[in-house]
């Protein structure tokens, strides 16, 4: 798996909108299975940063994995997305996986 961070919009010197961080899961062949993604807005002023909103999304790329639930939260200078994915064999549920991804913004607007 890998983490990918993308900054979509930088509105002003103190507001960062649409910062995205995604974790994608691959099978042994290197094909993507599903991902969970957090999109967050931040404010920062050189002394501190605050996450003002966080949204979760998830997507499955294969028919035998389904996204069962997503949730988001924010705290301080971070936003988190959590997804629950279910695995199926011949349409029968065989197990699930929960994964989270968290995005941070520092006091200068640097996202990680």
Question: What are these language model-derived features?
Answer:
Residues 1-28:
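N-terminal prepro-regions of secreted/extracellular proteins
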Residues 30-32, 91, 109:
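Residue-level signal for glycine
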Residues 8-12, 52, 57, 84:
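Compositionally biased non-globular segments, especially hydrophobic aliphatic-rich helices
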Residues 100-112:
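Short, low-complexity, Pro/Ser/Thr/Gly-rich segments in the mature regions of secreted, periplasmic
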Residues 3, 35, 78-80:
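Intrinsic-disorder/low-complexity, polar/charged segments enriched in Ser/Thr/Lys/Arg/Asp/Glu/Gln
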Residues 71-100:
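Extracytosolic low-complexity repeat regions of secreted or lipid-anchored proteins
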Residues 49, 77-81, 109-111:
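Hydrophobic residues embedded in beta-strands of well-ordered beta-sheets
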